[in-house]
Amino acid sequence: PPLAPLLPTEKGASLLIDCGANVDARPSHLVQFAKMGSIYMENVMGIRNPRVAIVNIGAEEEKGNALVKETFPLLKECKDINFIGSIEARDIPSGYADVIVCEAFAGNIILKLYEGVGATLISMVKKGMLSTLRSKIGALLVKPALKETLKRFDTSQYGGAPMLGLKGLVVKTHGSSKSTEVCN
């Protein structure tokens, strides 16, 4: 069963599947992840015909490691999903795909980078907004919109990641999660 957190994007959120449960996944596993992710985004998030992409080092079909090269044609042939091809890490925040498929090693790196960039961005913006009198005045004007935008990158807003493919509900959280995160 894969862990499938939602990542904030410019268009809303994308489901990253898998981010920590299956480091040594096989092509058949990634196809199953794509199907589960597509079903989740359609039935839970209300996205009709979700766009599914596989994490790769380039957009071209022939690029990637053995796992990606073996999985790509299987996803392409799969009639149950709306497979749009490869996605590079830099395109994830744009919301290019609704479901982002990968094995857990790559997925965990993507997730941790997202968390780190989010925390750093929040910290940098706060420091910048409080650095001069002029920026403090400007901060008062943009505070509501900025606060709402930055909140999407605050990991405490996301309680955890659902583990899909099980008969019951399982949500994995960080061991350091506080009550706010568990409630979300």
Q: What spans do the regions from the language model cover?
A:
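Glycine-rich phosphate/nucleotide-binding loop
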Residues: P1-L16, Y96-I100, A104-C183
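A generic local secondary-structure boundary/capping motif
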Residues: P2-P8, A21, I39-G46, E88-D91, ...
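Low-complexity, intrinsically disordered basic tails/loops
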Residues: S14-R26
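Short, flexible active-site loop motifs that bind/organize anionic cofactors or intermediates
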Residues: G20, N82, K172
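Glycine-rich beta-alpha junction loops
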Residues: A21-V23, N56-E61, I87-D91, E103-G107, ...
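Glycine-rich phosphate/diphosphate-binding loop of Rossmann-like nucleotide-binding domains
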Residues: V23-A89, D98
